[in-house]
From Swiss-Prot:
One of its GO terms (biological process) is cysteinyl-tRNA aminoacylation. A motif ('KMSKS' region) lies at residues 275-279. This is Cysteine--tRNA ligase. One of its GO terms (cellular component) is cytosol. SMART domains: DALR_2. InterPro entries: Cys-tRNA-ligase (IPR015803), Cys-tRNA-synt_Ia_DALR (IPR015273), Cys-tRNA/MSH_ligase (IPR024909), CysS_C (IPR056411), Rossmann-like_a/b/a_fold (IPR014729), tRNA-synt_1_cat_dom (IPR032678), tRNAsynth_Ia_anticodon-bd (IPR009080). Monomer. A motif ('HIGH' region) lies at residues 31-41.
Length: 477
């Protein structure tokens, strides 16, 4: 069966055909690091981790780029507010602190490190190059009020609105800079001229004066830098469809780039039946979530619904996940104990059942895939009851394969070693970062550097295993 994904732009399921045979380029909008990460950030990271794992299992080499928006209005505003109350933390330090929180939470959930994780501030020249092209093509203009702002001219691009199937006339004005300098209220900022109350460190030189990039141009530039002018999948939360992704598509296409071939969006998170929001005071931080249960249960809970659905987090969510995981772990414990010393030990083929593959190929239907997983656990237990060790071994192999694909295998070294100590969590973060650096080296065929990282980890007692589902590590016994 061919993998099918719901493409937001097409408004329909489409067969997934990579631009290059055997390879997938995927860009995912990462966090804007103006505050601590919350449950919505983790849900999004987990969704694209599941997609990446399935593509990898299917034999595709995935290049995943997930950006970090480390400069924008909110980052600067939050840093300024903290300084007004007597703090001394600079905006870039605040952004880095929250970036580290997001990374640590992602590692705790078993989210594999992106191939590339660029910060917006490291791609300023690439952003300016796209802006210059847009000006030359007549799709952008510098504000005439001396502010240093540069805007995208929405009226110059008739296709504007194609992602969300809206007409420009039906859209409201963008509220991202002084509207008096715009030709049209719906025009959006590509470059924001420096303001008097903003720090020197947040201003970058440009042909239009010192300033900083608008939010939308950041992702267009970073995706192009790491994946090229055309790539396979652009992902992000449902709340980013408009205006962020609509603006990304318009400015990249107007600059002459084909951009993303598939647009994939994950659903949002409700808390106790209500939309999560600051005004309701019901936001659940990553720290709160990971403190409420072991990370494996959090991963199972957030990843058990269909990625496009809105999930509802409530008091019983994590206990339901724990119960499901106990059934899986209980089967592994029982079958391994019974098969020990028999000719069936290790005989089960670690291949997912056809029904599981069909579910995952059907727009990543994880709920149906989990149903297959739990049915296989039940049949495996029934085989043990009947002393059918061959069938039990086969079921074990299938359960192992399915839980590996979903990242919820309780036998995985990560989950066996997920403890409550800060030292263990710090070790996991450090090892994952080194593995990320190793993957980057391999991407550019710098095998000397990649081997050196592996040797350093081995010397520290860390075993590295490269598998079809990704790189796994464990501490040598």
């Amino acid at each position: 069966m061919t993998l099918r994904l719901f493409d937001t732009k097409a408004g329909a399921l489409r067969d997934f055909v990579p631009l290059r045979s055997g390879e997938v380029g995927m860009y995912v909008c990462g966090p804007t690091v103006q505050a601590s990460p919350h449950i919505g950030h983790l849900r999004s990271a987990l969704v694209y981790d599941q997609l990446r794992r399935w593509l990898t299992y299917r034999g595709l080499a995935v290049t995943l780029v997930r950006n970090v928006t480390d400069i924008d209005d909110k980052v600067l505003a939050n840093a300024a507010a903290a300084q007004a109350e007597g703090g001394s933390e600079q905006w870039w330090a605040l952004a880095y602190r929250f970036e580290r929180e997001f990374t640590a939470a992602s590692v705790a959930l078993g989210v594999q490190a992106p191939t590339y994780e660029p910060r917006a501030t490291a791609s300023i020249p690439q952003m300016q190059e796209i802006i210059q092209r847009l000006i030359e093509r007549g799709h952008a203009y510098a504000a005439g009020d001396g502010s240093g702002d540069v805007y995208f001219d929405v009226r110059s691009w008739p296709a504007y609105g194609e992602l969300t199937r809206q007409s420009a006339d039906s859209m409201e004005a963008a509220a991202d800079a002084d509207p008096r300098a715009k030709r049209d209220g719906r025009d959006f900022a590509l470059w924001k001229g420096r303001k008097a109350d903003e720090p020197d460190s947040a201003a970058f030189p440009s042909p239009w004066g010192e300033g900083r990039p608008g939010w939308h141009i950041e992702c267009s530039a970073m995706s192009r830098r790491y994946l090229g002018p055309r790539f396979d999948i652009h992902g992000g939360g449902l709340d980013l469809r408009f205006p962020h992704h609509e603006n990304e598509l318009a400015q990249s296409a107007a600059a002459g780039d084909s951009f993303a071939n598939y647009w994939v969006h994950n659903g949002l998170v409700n808390v106790n039946g209500q939309k999560m929001s600051k005004s309701l005071g019901n936001s659940v931080s990553a720290a709160e979530l990971l403190g409420a249960a072991r990370p494996l249960a959090v991963r199972y809970s957030l990843g058990s619904a269909h990625y496009r659905s809105t999930i509802d987090y409530h008091d019983g969510s994590l206990s339901e996940a724990e119960a499901a995981l106990e059934r899986i772990a209980g089967f592994f414990e029982r079958v391994d104990r019974r098969l020990a010393g028999t000719r069936f030990t290790g005989s089960g083929s670690e291949v997912v059942p056809i029904a599981f593959a069909e579910a995952m190929d059907d727009d990543l239907a994880v709920p149906q895939a989990l149903a297959v997983l739990h049915e296989t656990v039940r049949s495996g237990n029934a085989a043990l009851d009947a002393e059918d060790l061959e069938a039990a071994a086969a079921a074990r192999g299938q359960v192992f394969a399915m839980t590996e694909v979903l990242g919820i295998n309780p036998l995985s070294p990560q989950w066996r070693q997920t403890g409550s100590s800060a030292a263990e969590q710090a070790l996991g973060t450090l090892v994952e970062r080194l593995l990320h650096n190793r993957q980057e080296a391999r991407q550019v065929r710098d095998f000397v550097a990649a081997d050196r990282i592996r040797e350093e980890l081995t010397g520290a007692g860390i075993t590295i295993e490269d598998t079809p589902t990704g790189c796994h590590w464990s501490i040598e016994a």
